[in-house]
């Protein structure tokens, strides 16, 4: 089944190429911004955007996976609808043509007849991409295709993508904002159990050539199925974090000052959570944009924990990273349920699942992570972190 993961790596790189191509030329990029309709808006942001790049990426992933694995394209779900309305009021369903010329014709309708822009985009969409990881060649795992579902966030952190800041200074390796926070997220889950099985995170904008102004990216993946756990971060990226993790394992977790966790949070995090975190983490609280990027910071060992207490992340935001973290021995859990859970009962941690929507919810809210989330690399670390967090949270905070 590594052939599915290999293909996901390839289409994620094609997606990254589209994201870079759309961002490269400012005049083209301005044409691509479409405001989202009311039912599709993420309520966290006053203004949220749907870009043609978003829709193109999602359709490219669907089309490519369906061509290679018939039937799988119908089980790919994501944030974006594929409907556009152009300046003439025409409703256009975005479907990729089998040829570059047919895609040009459709894109021309979306872009109000702008042939040059349509040709430039169609070329990237139909361009062959050769991208794989030799580490997957030796992997032989048989996962039945009919149990697989796929969540896609074609361009996570759309606001940072549109803003396009390229000169943000990182804080201990973590970018608070900017193009580095943009990710392409593809998560594969078991449609029967909701357990994440495979994840790909492609970061299209990692480093920029100062002469050509062109960007290079990076891709990360993980697979966790029936006891087989492999990922692209062997050996681990951050030796700093490894040594800290080892020291945390040897120190007394009940000793308040013995060690500090590092945590990455959203700038919009609740004051009650931030206040408690200041006791648990001290100065090691980092702010960053994008749910995918914050999860990636945990995967890369730049932070121990990603915590988010609100209900404005969704299945497509978390599935890819969750699968990679599972392959690393970590996971992603429901924050509200964790805070209400009695660790002495021996019950399993409330892992996020991906196959059922929220009862009674409509639109995107049916796929929201309603209880918030915590992403982590080590279960032992998480248990210690939660016990300390609860010591500093007012009782009301666990029920909001």
From Swiss-Prot:
Tell me the cofactors it needs.
Answer: Mg(2+)
Pathway named in the protein's UniProt entry: Signal transduction; phosphatidylinositol signaling pathway
Residues recorded with modification Phosphoserine: 318
> A Gene Ontology MF term for this entry?
metal ion binding
Pfam hit, one: Inositol_P
List of residues binding 1D-myo-inositol 1,4-bisphosphate: 156-158, 268, 270, 290-291, 294, 312
Top enzyme class, one word, equals hydrolase
Its GO biological process annotations read: phosphatidylinositol phosphate biosynthetic process
**Catalytic activity line of the entry:** 1D-myo-inositol 1,4-bisphosphate + H2O = 1D-myo-inositol 4-phosphate + phosphate; 1D-myo-inositol 1,3,4-trisphosphate + H2O = 1D-myo-inositol 3,4-bisphosphate + phosphate
Residues reported in the UniProt entry to bind Li(+)? 54, 80
Q: Does the keyword Mitochondrion apply?
A: no
What family is this? Belongs to the inositol monophosphatase superfamily.
Relate the protein's function as given in its record: Mg(2+)-dependent phosphatase that catalyzes the hydrolysis of the 1-position phosphate from inositol 1,4-bisphosphate and inositol 1,3,4-trisphosphate and participates in inositol phosphate metabolism.
In terms of PANTHER family, this protein maps to: 3'(2'),5'-BISPHOSPHATE NUCLEOTIDASE 1 (PTHR43028), INOSITOL POLYPHOSPHATE 1-PHOSPHATASE (PTHR43028:SF3)
* UniProt protein name: Inositol polyphosphate 1-phosphatase
In the UniProt record, the gene name given for this protein reads INPP1
């Amino acid at each position: 089944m590594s052939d599915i993961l290999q293909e996901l790596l390839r289409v994620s790189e094609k997606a990254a190429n589209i994201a870079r191509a759309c961002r490269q030329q400012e005049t083209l990029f301005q044409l691509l911004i479409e405001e989202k309709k009311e039912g599709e808006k993420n309520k966290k942001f006053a203004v949220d955007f749907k870009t043609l790049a978003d829709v193109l990426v999602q359709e490219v992933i669907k089309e490519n996976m369906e061509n290679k694995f018939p039937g799988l394209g119908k089980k790919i779900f994501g944030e974006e609808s594929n409907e556009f309305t152009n300046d003439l009021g025409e409703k256009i369903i975005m479907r990729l043509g089998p040829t570059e010329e047919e895609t040009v014709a459709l894109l021309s309708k979306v872009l109000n007849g702008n042939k040059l822009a349509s040709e430039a985009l169609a070329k990237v969409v139909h361009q062959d991409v050769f991208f794989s990881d030799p580490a997957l060649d030796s992997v032989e795992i048989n996962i039945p295709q009919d149990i697989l579902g796929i969540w896609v966030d074609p361009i996570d952190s759309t606001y940072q993508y549109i803003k396009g800041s390229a000169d943000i200074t990182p804080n201990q390796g973590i970018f608070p904002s900017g193009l580095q926070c943009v990710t392409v997220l593809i998560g594969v889950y078991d449609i029967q159990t909701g357990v994440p099985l495979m994840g790909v995170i492609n970061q299209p904008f990692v480093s920029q050539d100062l002469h050509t102004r062109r960007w290079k990216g990076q891709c990360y993946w993980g697979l966790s199925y029936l006891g087989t756990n492999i990922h692209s971060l062997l050996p681990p990226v951050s030796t700093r974090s490894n040594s800290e993790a080892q020291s945390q394992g040897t120190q007394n977790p009940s000793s308040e000052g013995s060690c500090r966790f590092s945590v990455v949070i959203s700038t919009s995090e609740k004051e009650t959570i931030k206040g408690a975190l200041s006791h648990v983490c001290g100065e090691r609280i980092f702010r960053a944009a994008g749910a995918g990027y914050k999860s990636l910071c945990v995967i890369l060992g730049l932070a121990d924990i990603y915590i988010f207490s609100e209900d404005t992340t969704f299945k497509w935001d978390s599935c890819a990273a969750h699968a990679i973290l599972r392959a690393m021995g970590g996971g992603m859990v429901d924050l509200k349920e964790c805070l209400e859970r009695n660790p002495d009962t021996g019950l399993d941690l409330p892992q996020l699942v991906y196959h059922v929507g929220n009862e009674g919810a409509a639109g995107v809210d049916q796929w929201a992570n309603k209880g918030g989330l915590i992403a982590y690399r080590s279960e032992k670390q998480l248990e210690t972190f939660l016990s300390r967090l609860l010591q500093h949270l007012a009782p009301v905070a666990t029920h909001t």
